[in-house]
Every structure is written in C-alpha cells, then in structure tokens.
Amino acid sequence: MNRQEQIKFIEDNYPAYTNHHSKRRVRHDFFNNIQTELQAYLLGFYVSDGNINEKRKTFRIHLQERDSELVYLYKDVISPDARVFSVAPHEVTGRNGAKVQASGSFGVDICSTILCRDLVNLGFGYSKTYSENHLPKIDKSLIRHFIRGYFDGDGSIMWWYQKADPKWKKNERIRSAVSICSKTNTILLDIQEFLKRHDIKSSICFANRDQMYQMSIPKSQLKKLYNLFYEDSYFYLKRKYKKFNHYVNTEETQLIAEFRNAQGMSASNSNNSPTSVEHPTK
C-alpha cells in the first residue's frame, strides 16, 4: 500500500470515536493490531522518543520545532481533534552544569486508556526508557519500518572530514557512520540480529560519557542500510532521509568539496596536518 492507501486503510479499519472522558475523537485501537508500515513506523518512533503518562493515561510526542511534521502525523492519524502545544526557546542545564540554549519544541498529547494499555501490552509501557525492550512481535515484513522509526527518534548520521596524512600516504577522505542509542542494550541486540540477517554489519558499545549503549553501522554498510530503510517506504523523517540520501549517493570528492566550501578552506590548506571534524545529524 502507498501512503494514501495506508491512511485510508487506517480510517476504514480503526475508527476514531469519542467517549465519556473526552469529546475529542481518538483511534483508541491504533496500536492494538499493527498491520501497516505507518503503524510500525509510528510505534518505533514512540519507543525511542515518546512517552505515556500512567496517571493521566496520556500518550505524548514532544519534538524540536523542525520535526513538527511528525507531531502532525501522530495527531492527524490517531486523534484529529487533539491539541498541539509549543514551548519557546529557553535556557537549560547541559552536560557538566553548562548553560545551553534549548531550541523551541512542539508536541501533542492524546488521552486514551486503551491506547496506553495496548502500548503496555506490546512491551513499551510507562518506564520503557530503562526497560529491557525488544523488537515487537509483529509481521516480519514490518520490522524494518519499526527500526526506521526508532532510528528517526534515537539515531544519528555522523560524518568526519579527515585531512590527508603524507606521512602514512593517506589522502583526505570523508568517514561516516550511523549510530542508534538506547539506555539498555536488549533492543539494540535485537536490531543487530535483524540487520545481520540482511547482511549488514554493526557493533555495540557502552558510551560512558552519555551513560547509554550505542550501536554503530560503519560507512561500508550504509548503502545497504539506506536501501533497507527507504526502499518502498512512505513514512520517515524527511530531514534525516535527505541527509542520509545525500551522504550515501554523493561522490566522496563532492562531499570533500562541500566541506571545504563550508569551512572556507582551499585544497592546499586541506592537506596540512591530519585532523578530523565530526558532523553528527540526529
């Protein structure tokens, strides 16, 4: 099913209705039976970057303003009448007590006891961040869409420019990798096993600085991961897709030229002492 066909399928098979608690229409059974790419993707994104409130029985997605497209997707598909909210840019305390400026954010709250119950039954309940989560028991053809959703929430595309090193006869180059993070390693181990079945290599380590586990997929595997994620797929974070597509399908010489232009470097300056500059894109 294409994008519109999936949305029509949801509208026909998961009716939105009100109840005595609220006059807002909600597709309370949206996560009860995962049958489409759309449901699997939104479930994966929720697992990495959403939450449910046990007391209020409220499902929440709260993202940076630049990713508001996903907030509206949750709203339009699950609860067309739900209210969205925004938070203005503000100062927060970052790593080592440093004050940093947080960007504006955007979110949606959906009240539904049934929706929250189904997420708990799927294994992604009220304390999922620190729980030993696993890939959900859904149709195998939908797992890649769940993982893409998880990646859009807690994954990063990283690339490094590395200067030439005449001593070791190494030319300047672009190095890149994809990382996916989690507070526990169980879901990453499941993802790793799934990727292995698709001939995609990865590694998992514990990042002490961030106190979380990190899966890394090296540059040599990114084309295969890109195809697994996006081939015949209709739901994804556009910003990440554009970055991923650019890094995977652009010649390395062009990426090097783009880096030089961005840094105001000439070709001769880029061949000085070896160094690397990291550019993560979450």
Regions found by a protein language model. Give the residues of each.
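Internal intein/HINT superfamily modules and their associated LAGLIDADG
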Residues: 1-282
